[in-house]
């Protein structure tokens, strides 16, 4: 089941996503987040996390770094700084060096 869902996301990334300008406000992109969540949490919880993330990605949020957390949650990762490297941090956070 997990491989089928990842395959569907890959089809989206290859065939549909290139037709539109980039609009994801987060890093990693929502489709990459979905794949990471499916790999880390399995098909059911990963799908729920991926859909939740996609719903959070809208013009009313600031966005930024939001990697898949180690524990299941439908909310934004509360500690993204644990995963940021210096380049990503400087890209998304103006107060970083």
From Swiss-Prot:
Keywords: Cell membrane, Membrane. It holds the Pfam family YidD. GO terms for cellular component: plasma membrane. The keyword Magnesium does not apply. It is a peripheral membrane protein. The keyword Nucleotide-binding does not apply. It comes from the Bacteria. It is found in: Cell membrane. NCBIfam families: membrane protein insertion efficiency factor YidD. Could be involved in insertion of integral membrane proteins into the membrane. Belongs to the UPF0161 family. HAMAP family: UPF0161_YidD. This is Putative membrane protein insertion efficiency factor. It comes from Lactobacillus helveticus (strain DPC 4571).
């Amino acid at each position: 089941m997990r491989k089928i869902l990842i395959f569907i996301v890959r089809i989206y990334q290859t065939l549909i996503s290139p037709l539109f300008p980039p609009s994801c406000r987060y890093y990693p992109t929502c489709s990459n987040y979905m794949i990471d969540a499916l790999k880390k949490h399995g098909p059911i919880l990963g799908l729920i996390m991926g859909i939740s993330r996609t719903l959070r990605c809208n013009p009313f949020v600031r966005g930024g770094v939001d990697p898949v957390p180690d524990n299941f949650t439908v909310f934004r990762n509360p500690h993204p700084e644990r995963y940021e490297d210096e380049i990503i941090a400087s890209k998304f956070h103006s107060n970083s060096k």
